[in-house]
From Swiss-Prot:
Membrane topology: Multi-pass membrane protein
Keyword Cell inner membrane recorded: yes
SUPFAM superfamilies, per database record: Proton glutamate symport protein
Protein name: C4-dicarboxylate transport protein
Amino acid sequence: MTTRQPLYKSLYVQVIIAITIGILLGHYYPETGVALKPLGDGFVKLIKMVIAPIIFCTVVSGIAGMQSMKSVGKTGGYALLYFEIVSTIALIIGLVVVNVVKPGAGMHIDVSTLNASSVAAYAAAGAQQTTVGFLLNVIPNTVVGAFANGDILQVLMFSVLFGFALHRLGSYGKPLLDMIDRFAHVMFNIINMIMKLAPIGAFGAMAFTIGQYGVGSLVQLGYLMACFYITCLLFVLVVLGGICRAHGFSVLKLIRYIREELLIVLGTSSSESALPRMLAKMERLGAKKSVVGLVIPTGYSFNLDGTSIYLTMAAVFIAQATDTTMDITHQITLLLVLLVASKGAAGVTGSGFIVLAATLSAVGHLPVAGLALILGIDRFMSEARALTNLVGNAVATVVVAKWVKEMDNDKLASELASGGAPLVDARPTDDLGVAEGPAR
C-alpha cells in the first residue's frame, strides 16, 4: 500500500500558496513586489537553460529508435494538419467574439494622442517579420548557434536531421543513441532540481506583476480582459473539449492530469517553463516518445491557440477603440495575414506583441500606435494565452498519437482516471513505460 504524499510537499499546493502570497505582497507592498522580479526571471532562465538539450535528446531518441522512417513523416504531417485547423478555428472565434461583444466601442481614442514611443520597439521588430524571413530563420547559421540562442525551431530541425542520420547508421550508431539516452537522464534530473524552485519563481513573478501594474489600473480595459479570458475558457471547454470527446477522452481529466504544469505557467506567464515536464508527462500518459518529441516542441510555434484568439481580438479592439472602420473585406484580410503571421509567434522575443505589430503594419488599415492601448494589460492577458496554449498542445499530442496509432489507450484511460500522480521524477521512460534508473 502506497503512502500518500503530505499536502505541503505537493508542488501543486506549493505553487498555489506562492502565487497567493505574491498577489498579496504585490498589492500591499508594490515597491517590494517590483523588486522581486529577478526571482521570476531567474526561474524561467533556469528552465530555458535546459530546453534545447532536452528537445534534442527527446527527438533524436524517438526518431532513431523507430522501426520505420515513414512513420516520422506521417506524424509530422498529421501534426501540421491538426495545428492549421485548430489554430484557424481559434482565430475565427476571437474575431467573432470581439465583433459581437465590441469591448472597444465607445472609447473614441484619438490616435494622435497615444504615446507611440512606448510601442516603437515592437513595431520596428514587427515590420521586420516576413514569411520568407521566418522560414529561413528555421535554418540555423551554425549548430552551436541554435543551441546557444535557445531557438526551439532551429534546435528541432537539427534534431530531426540528426535522428534520421543516426537511424541510418543502424547498429553502428547504437552506442551513440545509448549515450544520448543517458545524457537525457542527466538533463531531466537537472529539471527535477530546478522545479523545486518553482514556488519561488511563481511568487516573484506574480509579486512583480501586481506590484508593477496594480489591480486598479485594469478597470478601464477590464472589459477586454474579461472577454478574452471567457473566450479562452469557452475555447478550451467547447472546441478542445469537443475534439477530446470525439477521440474518447475528457478535456477536464486531461487538465487535471497537467494541473501542476498549468500552475507553473500561471505563475510565470511562460508556457516554455513547463515544456520539459510536458515532454515527460505526455509520454507517461501513453503517447510514444517519437510523437511527443515532434508534436510538443513544434506546437510551441505552430499550435498557439490562446495567442491566436488574442491576436484577432486585440487587432479589432484597437480598431473599435480608435473608431477605425473595419468592414468584412478588412477583417478577412486580417484573418488571412494572421493565418501566416501567428505561426511564428514563438520564434521571437515578446512574440504576441511583435506579431500583432507586424499584422497591423501588413494590413495597413489599422493604427500601429494603437498598440499603446493594450500595452499595460498585455502582461495580465499573457496568463490566459499561455494556459490555453499549454492545454492545446496537450490535446494535440494525444489526438495526433491516436491518429498515427502510437497511443497506449489503456494507459491513457488509467492515467486520466487516477488524475496522474505528481511527477516526482521527470525523466524519460523506457519501452515499458517505467522510469529507468540513473546511468551507472
